[in-house]
Amino acid sequence: MKVSRHTKILEIINLKDIETQEELAEELRRSGMEVTQATVSRDIKELKLIKVLSSKGRYKYATISPTESFLSNKLVTIFAQTVLNVDRVNNMVVVKTISGSANAAAEAIDSLNLDGIAGSIAGDNTIFILSRSEETAFNIVQKLKKMINE
């Protein structure tokens, strides 16, 4: 069941610009599959789908190439090895790294395509991430801390 659902998801996102999990769930239902938004969310994670800018200027789900996946995994490893601390101040996330590593760690964060990030800036050993809300900042901190096993 899961394999056929994953295959159908990949087929759908290659044929249509799917912007939300709910849209994807609706397309799956139209093809005769009973799914919940939670199931679709898990499938998106397992398939490592990302959101990319479509030709219409809107974000849609897409797959990443094996090269991008390999590079992304390398960056996540660098992130885990160089980050010392992750903290939140209101809607801003502050990431402290070992000296000279902030740019590489910021590249890793960018490769994650996390929702709700308005922008980021990296210095020598500090990254500032501006999120769209305090709740989003909290969620980003949780995800980043999980990556460094904190």
From Swiss-Prot:
List the molecular function annotations (GO) for this entry.
arginine binding; DNA binding; DNA-binding transcription factor activity
Residue ranges that the Swiss-Prot or TrEMBL entry lists as coiled coil: none
Return the SUPFAM superfamilies for the record.
Answer: C-terminal domain of arginine repressor (SSF55252), Winged helix' DNA-binding domain (SSF46785)
One cellular component term from this protein's GO annotations in UniProt: cytoplasm
Q: Which Gene3D superfamilies match?
A: 3.30.1360.40, Winged helix-like DNA-binding domain superfamily/Winged helix DNA-binding domain (1.10.10.10)
What biological processes does GO assign it?
L-arginine biosynthetic process; protein complex oligomerization; regulation of arginine biosynthetic process
Domain of life per record: Bacteria
Q: Which UniProt keywords apply?
A: Amino-acid biosynthesis, Arginine biosynthesis, Cytoplasm, DNA-binding, Repressor, Transcription, Transcription regulation
Query: Where is the protein found, in the record's own terms?
Result: Cytoplasm
Listed InterPro entries: Arg_repress, Arg_repress_C, Arg_repress_C_sf, Arg_repress_DNA-bd, WH-like_DNA-bd_sf, WH_DNA-bd_sf
- To which pathway does this protein belong? Amino-acid biosynthesis; L-arginine biosynthesis [regulation]
PANTHER family, per this entry? ARGININE REPRESSOR
The function of this protein is: Regulates arginine biosynthesis genes.
The similarity annotation says: Belongs to the ArgR family.
Q: What is this protein called?
A: Arginine repressor
- Source organism of this protein record: Clostridium acetobutylicum (strain ATCC 824 / DSM 792 / JCM 1419 / IAM 19013 / LMG 5710 / NBRC 13948 / NRRL B-527 / VKM B-1787 / 2291 / W)
